[in-house]
Amino acid sequence: MTTSKPHEENLSPLSYRAAGVDIDAGERLVENIRPYAKRTLRPEVLAGIGGFGALFEISRKFNNPVLVAGTDGVGTKLKLAFESGRHDTVGIDLVAMSVNDILVQGAEPLFFLDYFACGKLDVDTATLVVKGIAAGCEQAGCALIGGETAEMPGMYPEGEYDLAGFAVGAVEKDRIITGTTIKAGDAVLGLASSGAHSNGYSLIRKIIEKNNVDLSADFHGRALIDVIMAPTRIYVKPLLELMRQVPVKGMAHITGGGLLENIPRILPEGVTAVLKKETWEMPPLFAWLQREGNVADNEMHRVFNCGIGMAVVVAPEYIDAAAQLLQSKGEIAWRIGTIREQRADEPRTILE
């Protein structure tokens, strides 16, 4: 009986790098991002980037804190980042989607963690992404205390990656905002968005593809790609200040589903929000998308924010003070509607 000799190439030693995972690249990334993460640190951070787990001490300024957690991604906006080579702002989008979500319950964002997954780690690209994440954390006032970089050969096409983010905040138990006190007669304030934010990009990409759009073309004085890729606005600092000075009854982060599906999430039974479309300025991007895609009006308001990134409900006597405060903090705010008693068989939010 004879046995075949092993092929000569099978005698060559294998390594993790040969299998597609570069540990050294991962370590270079950690060193690259460390100074960006350091800029986001808060006094409560006891241990951050580089350890097995991050440590965060709850501040004594809270008497009876409730932790509020949120997680989200950036969606198919990433596809446009890959195609355009613009990786520096999607990290801001990632932070915005989670911190704006937990903010609506009254929470101050405390810390943030990210998950970056790819088939082959490009250190320069990943550094740009995490630099954006750190910039978003600075805007939100929360600490970037950790994350995970997963290099998984064969899982993603070359040059592509996916992102997920996780935000944790805190709110005093007796100051949680639930929307339960909203009643007929209350006013709805809308805060301007910076663009499409991070929702509706599958439709945006379809419109671009169908019309063979030149993304470098001028669009109201800017390259169209710059307008489409504008990062999601982070509303944390102005709205935390608003909550300190004005009794806020409810807030809705206008994401997927638009005004029509997000405002009902904060309304108690028996009331409807009536919004007037002429009360705010819809950015040119949305008119362009509607025209180029032949998108129905109702569909536009179910997919996109259409110019309103956050809705705030206050009693009518506070509407002027709230608008003035927000405008003093750099926000554009309009009174966009009113709460009324719900009529038979009508939806929870109406656009007129």
From Swiss-Prot:
Annotated InterPro entries: PurM-like_C_dom, PurM-like_C_sf, PurM-like_N, PurM-like_N_sf, PurM_cligase
Protein name as annotated: Phosphoribosylformylglycinamidine cyclo-ligase
Biological pathway: Purine metabolism; IMP biosynthesis via de novo pathway; 5-amino-1-(5-phospho-D-ribosyl)imidazole from N(2)-formyl-N(1)-(5-phospho-D-ribosyl)glycinamide: step 2/2
Catalytic activity reported: 2-formamido-N(1)-(5-O-phospho-beta-D-ribosyl)acetamidine + ATP = 5-amino-1-(5-phospho-beta-D-ribosyl)imidazole + ADP + phosphate + H(+)
Gene name per UniProt: purM
Entry's transmembrane regions: none
GO terms for cellular component: cytosol
Record bears the keyword Cell membrane: no
